[in-house]
C-alpha cells in the first residue's frame, strides 16, 4: 500500500548512492513509526531489528530502495532491510 515516488525524484534522492541519517527517533503515526526524508513521509511497516543500536536513527547511515515495495536499508547492517511505506 501507500504512495509511490516518481522515478525521476527517486533517482535523484534515493537508492544505495544516496545514504542519509534520519536524525530524530521516528514518531508514531497511525500506529507506526514515521520519519521524513527528501520531501516524503515514510512509515516503518516492519520493526527494526533488536541488534540495531538504540540510537541507529542518529548514528547510522540508511537508504531507501525499491524492490516491489520500498525498503529501508542500514549500511551498518547490510543483511537487514525494513519494509516501509510512503504516506502523506
Language-model features, listed with the residues they occupy:
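Low-complexity segments
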Residues: 1-88
